[in-house]
């Protein structure tokens, strides 16, 4: 009571405008049904009940979605870059399969500087995030952009997300304090990392 919730419905793994438009239509049908019902009356002394505005967006978690972000933005209120899946699909390997054996060998041999599942690969996955942000905002200037996944709690990755123009990061609860600090440092310091 008394709160104004931010309601966002995120449609995962979309790869075409048509697919997202279809799924958005299903969500809008349900919302129209809900909105056609009477709003319960507020009790005496309480604020009147208002229906929250509902935003409908999609996850950018495949390379194709990043490449076609301009088309997806036409039918989306926001994007959330799902960097765990985007990293897997960009590198072509499963996080579960590589972290125990292959990744330590890659790091030891110097093939990668760090695991791309902890700190975003700025030259590959990061480029896709920049591309999605740029292409999406070219179509819809006010498009809300964010990231979800473990990268949302990594200081170096947060700096890159700030430079890409993302509005928010989300991460595991235990990473929230460092994410907040890193986001503030990115804003104050201009995100040079």
Predicted regions and their residues:
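Conserved alpha/beta-domain cores
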Residues: 1-193
């Amino acid at each position: 009571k008394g709160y104004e919730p931010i309601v966002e419905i995120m449609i995962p793994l979309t790869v075409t405008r048509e697919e997202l438009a279809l799924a958005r239509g299903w969500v809008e049908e349900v919302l129209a049904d809900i909105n056609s019902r009477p709003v319960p009356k507020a009790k005496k002394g309480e604020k009147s009940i208002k229906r929250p505005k509902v935003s409908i967006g999609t996850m950018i978690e495949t390379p194709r979605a990043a490449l076609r972000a301009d088309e997806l933005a036409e039918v989306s209120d926001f994007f959330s870059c799902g960097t765990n899946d985007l990293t897997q699909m960009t590198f072509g390997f499963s996080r579960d399969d590589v972290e125990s054996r292959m990744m330590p060998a890659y790091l030891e041999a110097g093939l990668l500087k760090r695991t791309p599942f902890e700190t975003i690969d700025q030259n590959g996955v990061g480029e896709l995030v920049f591309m999605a942000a740029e292409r999406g905002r070219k179509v819809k200037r006010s498009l809300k952009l964010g990231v979800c996944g473990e990268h949302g709690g990594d200081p170096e990755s947060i700096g890159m997300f700030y430079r890409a123009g993302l509005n928010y990061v989300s991460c595991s609860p235990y990473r929230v304090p460092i994410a907040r600090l890193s986001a503030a440092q990115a804003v104050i310091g201009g995100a040079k990392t």
